């Protein structure tokens, strides 16, 4: 198969949702269809000791939430599918947002009883910003939920995206009978031995069933007043195809996967800092690091840089340019994933995600190129932390482990590090409280370094250029610090303190990140 054909086979997407909407369960079912797992281990198995395949870190298994993004790959129906399962917990939005920079489409899982929730809305905004296609799976039809028409209306009103139902539920909860598949023009049956039936058989199968009569009315209404189906509008991110189903009972998931692969895009090009778009079909290899994860295997204190291949082909042992440092690196020890299990890979192409073993060479956002190509891809977004804690080692004899742990976890992007300009004290910044808990848990479990953490509360963070900085600007209402790149930054105690500073120093420019 030619390189072009290989690249065109790739489908790379992320699954996004609010916590508990069933995202990890649907990931399991997709892997099951891809033949990667023999049984779909649902997340509910906390007591039985069967954990979801994609939740691999110790703390995730204890809590039943995904706190890092897993990468999984399988072959299905002539396509090579790369799934990135992102953390649904709102405190992990940083890792999730960066992961969304490495995919060509998103699958949004919505709980039919709860509709669009806060975290889904936040993640959708990042996806919308990139103009990538969004496919919606409305989950948990095996339980009672909200009216399908109401859910579609909410998608359009809350997220501002037009929707088109690919199928429609016949009943819900105990009265759930199956799906009226508009796209494939058939019925998918929840009960009985037969999985499918023709639409013509519907009236006979569901004689006197009030839910089926309602479905026919709803569909008539949608055909008259709903949005038109448009493949181009889907690819442009302006129309979301909506699928109903139940991941827990594995109903409607395969139909979703088949249809998703029919319409999901091939690998996209990516923009460079100069505004050029690198074509995925270009023969020269290029890629960018969107995530760094330490200690994926606690037995080997390792670090892996996750790279999205943007163009060309990776071959084991190839030399690459690291544009940020101007130095070369050799990609000899490279892996692909199935959550915690991984295998060495000899080649991969545009659209694939590879893991490069890292001894401290790489940073999140790094561009890798070959030959004379020395461009850089557009930077990944940085997120401004909202809450802070002072941190120090509990045992001064463990300084070395403490510094190693902090350095690795900060490079991973799990937490942000700041140093007090005057005292040199370490301060950690996070988007949410859970990031601190995971940091503490991992420092103790993976680096054997107990830490003392003192809450500093919420702060308003702004960066300042070295040229504008005068240390006398520091006052009781702000803390002057340096970020991990040694850039000066002010941590203001609140918005009032920020406004007071801006009034006092009107010529000074303060910068805010995303």
Swiss-Prot record:
Residues 8-268 form the tr-type G domain. The keyword Protein biosynthesis applies. Its main location: cytoplasm. GO terms for molecular function: GTP binding; GTPase activity; translation release factor activity, codon nonspecific; translation release factor activity, codon specific. GTP binds at residues 17-24, 85-89, 139-142. It comes from the Bacteria. GO terms for biological process: regulation of translational termination. One of its GO terms (cellular component) is cytosol. CDD domains: RF3, RF3_III. Transmembrane segments: none annotated. Keywords: Cytoplasm, GTP-binding, Nucleotide-binding, Protein biosynthesis. HAMAP family: Rel_fac_3. Increases the formation of ribosomal termination complexes and stimulates activities of RF-1 and RF-2. It binds guanine nucleotides and has strong preference for UGA stop codons. It may interact directly with the ribosome. The stimulation of RF-1 and RF-2 is significantly reduced by GTP and GDP, but not by GMP. Belongs to the TRAFAC class translation factor GTPase superfamily. Classic translation factor GTPase family. PrfC subfamily. NCBIfam families: prfC, PRK00741.1, small_GTP. This is Peptide chain release factor 3. It comes from Streptococcus pyogenes serotype M5 (strain Manfredo). The gene is prfC.
